[in-house]
Amino acid sequence: MDCLDKIVQLKKMGKKIGFTCSTFELGPHSGHDVMLMECKQNCDFLIVGLLTDPTISRPEKNKPVQSTFERWIQITSNKYVDMVIPFDTECDLEDMLKIIMPDVRFCGEEYKGKTHTGSNIEGIKIFYNKRNHSFSS
């Protein structure tokens, strides 16, 4: 069963599909774990989009030190994560959101009130992760 078939099956079962994304560089560390735990507490099935290299869409960002495969291994082994889907660009992210149509998308609270990739897609509830800790994220 491929990723999309699995998601369709879960939706038919009435499961709440959640989605979050990040580069997850040098992690997952404690900040990532707290964020992923909060995501999983608010959905039945958590999909994580793994940004391969943020410099592709945003040259001002830092290139990851770890390979995509290293980061994929770390994220797939996290107990709160049910599926990991790598993506390359913000355009890929928007397409992925339109295809998956998760019930809830998790974003950091620093995005509240701001336009961000996929924020214009109707039908996806946005949940803003709290940053009420001092861990890096």
Predicted regions and their residues:
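Nucleotidyltransferase catalytic core that binds NTPs
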Residues: M1-S137
